[in-house]
Amino acid sequence: SPDSAENVKCADEWVAAAPGTDGALAMSMGHVILKEFFVDQQVDFFTRYNQHYTDLPFLVALEPDTTDAGAADDGGGAAYRPGKYVVAGDLDIPESTSENAMWKPAVLDARTGDVAIPNGSIGFRYGEEGWGRWNLDLGDIDPLLTVHGTATGTARVVLPRFDALDGKVSHVSRGVPVRRLGGRLVTTVLDLMLAQYGVRREGMPGTWPTGYDDPSTPATPAWQEEITSVPAEQVVRLAREWAENAIDTGGRGMILMGAGTNHWFHSDQIYRAMLVLTSITGCQGRNGGGWAHYVGQEKIRPIMGFQHMAFALDWHRPPRHMNQTAYWYVNTSQYRYDTFTADDVDAGTGVFTGKGVMDLLAQSVRLGWTPSYPTFNRSSLVLADEADAAGMAPADYVVDQLTTGALRFAVEDPEAEENHPRILSLWRANLLGSSAKGNEYFLKHLLGTDNAVTAAQAPPDKRPTGIEWPDDVPEGKLDLLMTIDFRMTSSTLFSDVVLPAATWYEKHDINTTDMHPFVHSFNPAIAPPWQSKTDWEAWKAVAKRFSELAVDHLGTRRDVVAKPLWHDTPEAMATVHGVVRDWRTGEVEPVPGRTLPVLVVAERDYTAVFDKMTSIGPLMETVGMLTKGVPYDVDREVEILRHRNGVAHGGAGDGQPRLQTDIHVADAILHLSGTTNGHLATHGFKNVEKRTGTPLHDLAAEHEGKQITFADTQVAPVPVITSPEWSGSESGGRRYAPFTINIERLKPFHTLTGRQQFYLDHDWILGMGEALPVYRPPLNMTELFGETALGEQNALGVSVRYLTPHNKWSIHSEYQDNLFMLSLSRGGQSIWLSDVDAEKIGVRDNDWVEAVNRNGVVAARAIVSHRMPEGTVYMHHAQDRLIDVPLTETHGRRGGIHNSLTRIMMKPSHIIGGYAQLAYFFNYIGPTGNNRDEVTMIRRRSNQDVEY
């Protein structure tokens, strides 16, 4: 923890790393562990674990490096860079002609010295030849973790480093042992990892650290000390203790982190560096071990039933799922303020030359990697009719229109009026007072109201080249904003329509989280007061009126849905070797489901929305259910619900199970989820067994007859059942730990190799220099946006890192404005800063301060504390501006919220799709809403007698 927080009080040891430098700390620990437990000695427990469950033994081809970095030969011979995984289809071996051969990565077998293709990769997950072979059983194969000792030579590999203060790339070259296979130089992932982490072995050429005390090169303890301020000796000791504990306990070492890790621009690299520590030491898939991401109420244990009910998959498929970060980045015009190009975040490889991040998003959308709605610049409701008029199938018509340019993706012209969002409904989400990264841009471009944006738009040389860029940018795109909530927030104040909602104590509902292994119920203590309604009744009322209006306005229409290439489907094998080819440039043909989104026509009877909402649709019986690639036959469950809930009479849902009440819906979710229905859990595991060829269904068999009902949860919280919906086993009463099924039952991870992967070989990731974990510092906001350099002082105060952690005086994002919480804190918004920074700008505790950057302005009370590190301030999140927020000296208007000083920035690697584990699915993968890299000027207000 960078500050002396509550968790520090209870810790045996405090590691006070500077904000945003956790990746450097983790990499230096990895350096020590790799050297002492993989090179100086080999630990049988670590060796066996990594042979079975990680990609360390898998082969990677080296490619000639023709960049300037590769030309800078230091005497080590020709330069190479890490390339693609070696797969069966690359080699002259019997498996090269097998089904999905380009999706079956290879290893070297220590017994024979030859190439082997182990079971378990994604190539075995799909197709006829993979039945019974999608498992982690190595059989007679003994994978070599390293070719050192059996190598035919060495090769000099050029590796990027980003640890300069400005974040710019430089390079270091190091030798790796190699073998030649089919004309390729190959090495293993472990061999590349050792080079990346600066762990030298005998005979390896290149630039290497002289020891742990060498600060000149990445990953040594001394190197990280200059970045994190954590003493090198402490890191060495902790790394040894971590590895020794893993050996002694069989992998019971855990890294627990908060959501803040996810909020840095380079969050993926922080995570990957941490995951190295847990995975190479055999801690993943263990009770008491692994990687625990503390994110709160975001895991829906009965996910299967929830998804099918929430997204109306019982009536129509596919759904339109969207990632919010990209949606708001586009529709609040924040992309126009990117005063940098995508080149600024790559490794000098030229993979993004001349492109902005918005160009890459548009490419990702048109290749089917990530969703974008509205999809096209014409209504999806007219395209099928146009196709009929042209005598073409709708999918063929859309492809033809796209290739001729007559139809475009909306993301390629986002400021065109026909591509704007028009209606936004907020359901228990305080978007405009809490969660909107870049809040002032929302006010400016989405609502067209007062805002504090002073940022300059991108100059011509920094603008995207593949989208339309009108000089005049719209302000106020929405026509209607509706909010359903039980409390007053900024969002309700900005809304055109507010529908009052029942609280948790006035409705029936079910609740599960990733923090506990139970299903809970909410039960009303009183009926919803006055005009308020429960969620279900409120949306029923909206659906009923909508259906009535649709008789005259919409009727029945055919809708062309563009769906991205989904994870856990064969669509994740669309991009062979992760090589990016764009149909727009003629590199490949536009093929829906491979180089384009999947195009599906859905017939929608808009007059029947209410009928469909209040009954379970026929697709559950005619098609069944599918969750995480596992099919389920739920005819039995639907029939049970007919008897339990009754059936609808008349209308679209005639004869189908009713969903008239919130209890009906809760029971439907519980009956249609393996975690709450033992029959479905057992049935699902039996289906998985057909593909894996390994026993699994016994994990749920003890509960095959168990059905958790809503009435059960009203009596007491009920433990859930082990199910294919999740990766952990709770069989026999044990507590849930992720990936225990993968480790104990040899079920593959849902990745390219079927293992935990340290190496990523997609073109974009290789181009960014992130094939392996690498330290990438917080973004340099001075270089990118012209903000004052950290630590500098001027008339506006002092420049500091601006972080927005979870609030100390609220309950998550609510009740900050509760009288008890206000009394415990300062009565309104506050900013924590160190006594050192306070002295620099003449601030005393409880003074009014203003924080100002290009994104907005905040006016708040100062909390001066020695627990805060110099150079960093905290404004706890979800401090809405409803109470005790004065007018600012900066512009004379009301101060902002914690997200008024932030904005959305998207990392290109987060919008990759169509490639094994790097494939889209809702709430699984996508760009993060990062805001931790931000900086601000903070100063004492000259007038402490504030006005409201």
Ranges and model annotations:
Residues 6, 495-522:
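Flexible glycine/proline-rich, aromatic-decorated loop/lid segments
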Residues 14-16, 424, 481, 498-500:
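Short, well-ordered beta-strand core segments
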Residues 11-17, 518-529:
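Short beta-alpha connecting loops at secondary-structure transitions
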Residues 155, 161-201, 208-211, 226, ...:
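Extended redox/cofactor-interaction regions of prokaryotic respiratory oxidoreductases
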